[in-house]
Regions:
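Flexible helix-coil transition and linker loops at the boundaries of alpha-helical arrays
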Residues: 39-48, 81-91, 185-197, 294-301
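Residue signature of alpha-solenoid helical repeat architecture, marking inter-repeat boundaries
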Residues: 46, 50-53, 87, 121, ...
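Start-of-helix register in tetratricopeptide repeats
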Residues: 50, 57, 91, 125, ...
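Canonical tetratricopeptide repeat
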Residues: 54, 95, 129, 162, ...
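Residue-level recognition of tetratricopeptide repeat
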Residues: 57, 64, 98, 132, ...
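Register position in tetratricopeptide repeats
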Residues: 61, 68, 102-103, 136-137, ...
C-alpha cells in the first residue's frame, strides 16, 4: 500500500511539472516566447503559412527541451496547416518528417523526408532526417548515403553528429569521437540552440562512458549541463557515471532529477538498480513499479516504450512471456541491431538459447563496441556450452567497459571466472588421464 502511494505521488509530481511548469524550465522561456509570438501572428492572420511553420518549429524545440510528446502533436497540427496553405513549403514537410520520426513512425518519417527532398534537393536537414529513419529500421548503407549527402550540403553540428552515431554503431569509436568534437565546435561557431549543443556534448560523454573512460565522460556530461542545465540525458548519464564510481547517493539524486524532468522507464529502472546494488530493496521495488506505471501511461500518450520495457522485464526476470512478445513486436517495424539484441536477450531468458544465438549474431553484425551486447552474447553462448565464445564475449564486455552496469558487470565477471575455472579443471583432468 505504501509502495502504491509512492508511485501515485511520483506520477502526480511528474504531471504537475508538465501542467504547471517549474523554475527549472527557465531556460525554455525563449522558446515559450517564440511560441507566443507565432500564435499572436496567427491570431492576426490565420492564413500565414510562415507563422504556422515557425510555430511548428518552436513546438518541436519545446518537445526536445522538456521531453513532452504533446508538443510534437501540436507541432504536427501547425505544420499540416502550413502545408495546406503553402503545399510546397519544404521546411514544413521536413519538420513534419521529424515529428513522425520522434514518434517512432519511421516509414512515415522517411516518406515525408523524401517529399521534402523533392521540394528542395539542397536542404541538407531533410537528408539527415531520412538517414535517421533509415538507421532505425536497420538500413545502414542507405542511411550512410543520406548522411554523406547531408554532409556534402552542410558541414554542421547536425551532419557531423549523425555521421558520428553511424560510426559508433560500426565500431569506429575514434571516428565518432572526432566527429562529435568537431560538431560541438561547429555548433558553437554557428550559435546553434543550447539544447542541440548540449545533446552533442552528452553524446560525446556517452561515447566515452561506453569505452569505460570515466574522466572524459564526466567532463562532457558536466559540460552538457553547463550548456543546458535541464539536459535530462546528461543528468542520467552523470548518474550512471556516479554509480560506476560508487558515489551512490549522488547517482540517486541525479537520477531523481532526470526523472522529474522526463519520466523515462530506463531512468527509473537504472535508479532501481542502484537501490538494489546497495541493498535498499524496498526503494528498488518502488522504482521498478514506476517503470511499469510509466509504460502504461505511455500507451495513453501514444509513446512507444516496447524496447525499454522488454529490456527491463528480461533484465529483472519478470513477465518473460509478455516481454518476449514486446521484443518481437519491435521487429515488426524496427530492424536495427538493438531490435535483434532485445529479441536475443528475451529468447535467452525464455530458455530459447538456439534462437537467441541467431538473433545476437545479427545484433553483433556491425561490429558495435557495446559492452551490453557483448555481455548478452557471452551469456547466450554460455547457456549453449560454447565455452570459448562465451569467454571471448564476456571478456570483451569487461575490457570494453568494466562499468557498463552496476549489477551485470559483476555477473559477467563471475561468469567469466567460472568458465576459466572449468577450462582449467578440464585441463588438469586431461593431464591426469594422460599420465
Amino acid at each position: 500500500m505504501k509502495s502504491r502511494k509512492y508511485i501515485t505521488a511520483i506520477i502526480v509530481a511528474i504531471l504537475a511539472l508538465y501542467v504547471f511548469g517549474s523554475d527549472s524550465f527557465a531556460q525554455g522561456t525563449r522558446t515559450d516566447n517564440q511560441i507566443t509570438y507565432y500564435q499572436q501572428l496567427l491570431r492576426r492572420n490565420p492564413r500565414n503559412s510562415k507563422a504556422y511553420y515557425g510555430l511548428g518549429d518552436a513546438l518541436i524545440r519545446k518537445a526536445r527541451e522538456i521531453g513532452d510528446p504533446d508538443y510534437f502533436n501540436r507541432a504536427e497540427e501547425a505544420l499540416k496547416r502550413s502545408l495546406e496553405i503553402a503545399p510546397n513549403n519544404a521546411g514544413a514537410m521536413r519538420h513534419l518528417a521529424y515529428v513522425f520520426y520522434s514518434r517512432h513512425e519511421f516509414e512515415a518519417a522517411a516518406a515525408h523526408a523524401c517529399k521534402a527532398i523533392e521540394m528542395d534537393a539542397t536542404d541538407g536537414d531533410s537528408y539527415g532526417i531520412l538517414g535517421d529513419a533509415l538507421l532505425e529500421v536497420g538500413k545502414y548503407d542507405e542511411a550512410k548515403a543520406a548522411y554523406e549527402k547531408m554532409m556534402q550540403l552542410e558541414d554542421s553540428l547536425y551532419s557531423r553528429s549523425r555521421l558520428a552515431g553511424l560510426k559508433s554503431l560500426q565500431g569506429d569509436t575514434a571516428g565518432s569521437i572526432a566527429d562529435l568534437e568537431r560538431a560541438i565546435a561547429v555548433g558553437k561557431e554557428a550559435k546553434q540552440p543550447a539544447e542541440s549543443i548540449a545533446w552533442t556534448e552528452w553524446q560525446l560523454g556517452s561515447d566515452y562512458f561506453a569505452l569505460g573512460k570515466l574522466q572524459e565522460a564526466e567532463r562532457y556530461y558536466l559540460q552538457s549541463l553547463q550548456t543546458y542545465p535541464n539536459s535530462y540525458r546528461a543528468l542520467a548519464g552523470l548518474a550512471q557515471l556516479r554509480g560506476a564510481q560508487k558515489r551512490y547517493d549522488e547517482a540517486i539524486d541525479l537520477y531523481q532529477k532526470a526523472i522529474a524532468i522526463l519520466p523515462m522507464p530506463d531512468y527509473a529502472a537504472a535508479l532501481g538498480d542502484i537501490y538494489a546494488k546497495i541493498g535498499r530493496q524496498g526503494q528498488a521495488k518502488q522504482q521498478y513499479e514506476l517503470v511499469e506505471y510509466i509504460g502504461r501511461l505511455s500507451i495513453l500518450n501514444k509513446v512507444l516504450y516496447n524496447r525499454e520495457l522488454a529490456y527491463f522485464y528480461a533484465d529483472h526476470d519478470i513477465k518473460l512471456k509478455e516481454s518476449l512478445e514486446l521484443a518481437q513486436r519491435e521487429l515488426d517495424y524496427r530492424r536495427d541491431i538493438y531490435a535483434y539484441d532485445v529479441v536475443a536477450w528475451n529468447l535467452y531468458k525464455n530458455g530459447k538459447a538456439e534462437e537467441a544465438r541467431d538473433a545476437i549474431e545479427k545484433a553483433l553484425s556491425l561490429g558495435t563496441r557495446d559492452a551490453r551486447l557483448f555481455y548478452h552474447a557471452g551469456m547466450i553462448y554460455h547457456s549453449l556450452h560454447a565455452k570459448d565464445k562465451a569467454k571471448e564475449y564476456l571478456a570483451r564486455a569487461l575490457s570494453t567497459n568494466p562499468f557498463f552496469h552496476p549489477i551485470f558487470a559483476e555477473t559477467a565477471a563471475q561468469a567469466l571466472k567460472q568458465l576459466e575455472r572449468s577450462v582449467q579443471q578440464a585441463g588438469v583432468e586431461g593431464q591426469g588421464q594422460g599420465g
